[in-house]
UniProtKB/Swiss-Prot annotation:
Entry cofactors: [4Fe-4S] cluster
Record gene name: rlmN
Subcellular location: Cytoplasm
Protein's recorded name: Dual-specificity RNA methyltransferase RlmN
Taxonomic lineage: Bacteria, Pseudomonadati, Pseudomonadota, Gammaproteobacteria, Alteromonadales
Keywords tagged on the record: 4Fe-4S, Cytoplasm, Disulfide bond, Iron, Iron-sulfur, Metal-binding, Methyltransferase, rRNA processing, S-adenosyl-L-methionine, Transferase, tRNA processing
Organism of provenance: Idiomarina loihiensis (strain ATCC BAA-735 / DSM 15497 / L2-TR)
Length: 378
């Protein structure tokens, strides 16, 4: 087994096939992998000694070559509406934020995929802070794992805290495709968290080549961050549009949905920026832009953050905008803002995370004698 003794393998980094291969290399039967996955994801167990249907020799062997390691909760804040924001410390000491949003019999977890974000959308706090690095598979799925464990996981209280996952936290998921896809596979896998395809949503700002690859690899719900009715405005507020314009983005989204068994319409996210993208003329333009794309539109009231140049559209402007879209037969929803009193709402995820990350990076650089730290973006 390659480097198994020199470096323990984090089992949360492996999807079903990866864990089976790991056990094969150990000389164990594949069913042992399935037993361990159930302990990992159905009971959120992180101690091999608690896996009582494994013999003692195997448990001892696993202790030597494997570990179960998820991000740790450094801090949590609870909103007046019940939303909880978790500051999660990653394996190198940096932080990301994860948000748990309860509503009736469902609870949605907003999961981060990167430390910071490279796309620099002008209305997003995370994008304003810059990009540091991608999260590993274990750091992504580990957010779900840790919240399930913390809030009362399977078999412990009878509660299943996370019923839905949205890849809408810090970062652009499609710029970390090779780690995001295995993590989502574990969300869907019956031996993982067992969520249905309709309960896992990936949101993207339009990395078109990666969206084409996503279509070939996994079927989950797709949400697209559009935020403008035309290329001129989108170039300004979502800079990646200069590389992949609206027409390319929508065409790729249509191809994804046409192949999908999870959804028939693209979910279009549109943040409402006061007197920037919220006029009735822009509503008409948006409807015409979407005329060939089966879609439902999610209007998102802007959530201000320190240093932002934008204001939130008034309720009356949002209502007028929605009515125009509905005149074209479009399905329109206005997202209810959750967790804004703890900076956990859409576009606000950063808190003191980036400042803490920068301090850690400076310390690491100093330890390395000022050597630049390489960052992968794809």
């Amino acid at each position: 087994m390659t480097n198994a003794i020199d470096k323990k393998v984090n089992l949360l980094d492996l999807n079903r096939e990866g864990i089976k291969e790991f056990f094969r290399e150990m000389g164990e039967k594949p069913f042992r992998a399935e037993q361990v996955m159930k302990w990992l994801y159905h009971f959120c167990v992180d101690d091999f000694d608690e896996m009582t249907n494994l013999n003692k020799a195997l448990r001892e062997k696993l202790k030597q070559v494997a570990e179960i390691r998820a991000p740790e909760v450094r801090e949590q804040q609870q909103s007046s509406d019940g939303t909880i924001k978790f500051a999660m410390t990653l394996f190198d000491g940096q932080d990301v934020e994860t948000v748990w949003i309860p509503e009736g019999d469902r609870a949605t977890l907003c999961v981060s995929s990167q430390v910071g974000c490279a796309l620099e959308c002008t209305f997003c706090s995370t994008g304003a802070q810059g990009f540091n690095r991608n999260l590993s598979v274990a750091e992504i799925i580990g957010q779900v794992w840790r919240v399930n464990q913390l809030l009362g996981a399977y078999g412990k209280t009878g509660i299943k805290p996370v019923t839905n996952v949205v890849m809408m936290g810090m970062g652009e998921p499609l710029l970390n495709l090779n780690n995001v896809v295995p993590a989502m596979e574990l969300m869907l896998d019956d031996l993982g968290f067992g969520l249905s395809k309709r309960r896992v949503t990936l949101s993207t700002s339009g990395v078109v080549p990666a969206l084409e690859k996503l279509r070939e690899r996994i079927d989950v719900m797709l949400a697209i961050s559009l935020h403008a009715p035309d290329d001129e405005l989108r170039n300004e507020i979502v800079p990646i549009n200069k590389k992949y314009n609206i027409e390319e983005f929508l065409a790729s989204s249509r191809r994804y949905v046409e192949q999908s068994k999870a959804q028939r319409k693209v979910t279009v996210e549109y943040v409402m920026l006061d007197h920037v993208n919220d006029s009735t003329d822009q509503a008409h333009a948006l409807a015409k832009t979407l005329k060939d794309t089966p879609s439902k539109i999610n209007l998102i009231p802007f959530n201000p953050f320190p240093g932002s140049d934008y204001g939130r559209s008034s309720n009356s402007r949002i209502d007028r905008f929605a009515k125009v879209l509905m005149e074209y037969g479009l399905t329109v929803m206005v997202r209810k803002t959750r967790g804004d009193d703890i900076d956990a709402a859409c576009g606000q995820l950063v808190g003191d995370v980036i400042d803490r990350t920068k301090r850690i990076l400076k310390r690491q650089q100093k330890q390395r004698g000022g050597e630049a730290i390489a960052v992968k973006t794809t």
